[in-house]
Amino acid sequence: MALMIFSMVFMFILLFKPLVFSMMNKKCLNSTYTSTVKWAFITSMIPLMMYMNSSKEIIILNWHWLTVHTIELKMSFKLDLYSITFMPVALYVTWSIMEYSTWYMKHDPHLKRFLNYLSLFLITMLILVTANNMFQLFIGWEGVGIMSFLLIGWWYGRTDANTAALQAIIYNRVGDIGLVIAMAWFYKNSNSWELQQIFSLGTTSNLPLIGLILAAMGKSAQFGLHPWLPSAMEGPTPVSALLHSSTMVVAGVFLLIRFHPLMSNNSMIMTTILCIGAMTTLFTAICALTQNDIKKIIAFSTSSQLGLMMVTLGINQPYLSFLHICTHAFFKAMLFMCAGSIIHNLNDEQDIRKMGGISKTMPLTASAMTIGNLALMGTPFMSGFYSKDLIIESMNTSNINSWALITTLIATSLTAAYSTRLIYFVLSNSPRCNSVINMNESDNKLTSPIKRLMLGSIFAGFLLSNFIQPVNMQNMTMPFTIKITAMLVTIMGVIVAMELNLMTQYMKMYPNNYNFNFSIMLGFFPTIIHRSVSKSFLNFNQKIATSLMDYMWLEKIVPNAVVMMNNAASATTSTHKGMLKIYFMSFILSMVMLMLIMS
């Protein structure tokens, strides 16, 4: 236990070292960041090996922060299966991304600040994962959010980057409302934010659980709060790789995994998670099919896999969801790094229709992208297979909503379709780019990280699946057709994608084809939420300001009131028409009649 605590403390000291050096204005080489994360990864393997040997969880109570009324806030770390396993995965992936960043961002004048931001991004995620109380978890949660804002908007001179960063932070604020509601409820009812005391409540109200679901929807870009995820591609590619693999987007799913003991017996909450995940995985898979931006295709694949993780939670399998988080991190980071390498060599071209033939000019990148897409599809014996196949089997053998099962199977097939489309357009056929472009992948800072993640994409699933077992015992026997369901839908997706890709070579496409507008326009969510709703509010407020207030004040009350008063006075004074003879005769007649009456 002492060795585990020492290795944890040493790991955090290593991660903070380059940050402290940069604050002290000491010279810190770019390679220092990479080597620091590498040694932190090696150190994090010690608790993992100790846990694999003993299977004992520990809680480290280090420092008493403060006391508010009857609640004590302590800095405490929970080292269980989730945190001990996730730390080496996150550090291994970040080690590769850090080294890749020194190549990708080498011409950026603020590279050291960029590496500091990446380090802080990693540290806040590790704080979130290892937190044993909700206050500490909230610090990591908000830290991940603010670092994503800074990194997505790194190129702050571009309007699109600033808008994307604002989208990310605003959508996450919506999710944060749910987390704050859950924290307030737990504080009121359990008088503690320690996870053990919260779990000891047993049954809880639906309110905090719905708050946790809302928080996960915002952070993990679930259906309804998803538009920020494709927009986040405006940031540098290393940011996309880290954001989508092992930090921010999986934080929401990890939150639900951490609080799964409170939800496991609540059928309404589990069904809600299941339906949200099923809608997300299908909708984003459909959107990925018709995108032409290579980074956005990979981004939508991330969102689809996050939906699959939510579906897994909805069928009461948190361990399988966590296994998919870990295996997904390797090949998703590698796919983004391959995309960045291709974009960099094609002079910032991101349209897959203007690529092609990359396998001949950049063989390592092409091989890595092929392996990454195969792992994403769940090809047997790739890392994605060990989690994805188990998830589909668990869904087939559980009492699941049939709609959610069919939706997830269709999304799995579409995953194979857009992955095949990506390989077909980017890697195969002849080049469709400018022939003057000089392509190369000779830099070790590019090739070494991709090779490391390639190994992880092949072997990580086998290694992790050996000690992350399903929480519920699976059927030892099942029909052969159910056993191969995942493979069948994947093969079907590949065949359909190949047929469609070949068909487009001979089919005349009309420019004004509106059949794909729903998918291309991302279900019209950005148009409706960002344009139509805001425009209607602006028009409504403008009408109140101009048509109601200005019209009443400037036309009815002040100028028109004066005019009306003048008209009334004028009408009153103009009743005398100046007919003196008639007036005099009327006066004489009235006087004569009065005298006659009086006499």
Swiss-Prot record:
The keyword Transmembrane applies. GO terms for cellular component: mitochondrial inner membrane. GO terms for molecular function: NADH dehydrogenase (ubiquinone) activity. It catalyses: a ubiquinone + NADH + 5 H(+)(in) = a ubiquinol + NAD(+) + 4 H(+)(out). Its EC number is 7.1.1.2. InterPro entries: NADH_DH_su5_C, NADHpl_OxRdtase_5_subgr, ND/Mrp_TM, NU5C-like, Proton_antipo_N. Keywords: Electron transport, Membrane, Mitochondrion, Mitochondrion inner membrane, NAD, Respiratory chain, Translocase, Transmembrane, Transmembrane helix, Transport, Ubiquinone. It is an enzyme of class 7 (translocase). The chain crosses the membrane at residues 1-21, 41-61, 79-99, 114-134, 137-157, 166-186, 198-218, 237-257, 269-289, 297-317, 323-343, 362-382, 400-420, 453-473, 478-498, 509-529, 578-598. Its main location: mitochondrion. PANTHER family: NADH-UBIQUINONE OXIDOREDUCTASE CHAIN 5. This is NADH-ubiquinone oxidoreductase chain 5. It comes from Geomys personatus (Texas pocket gopher).
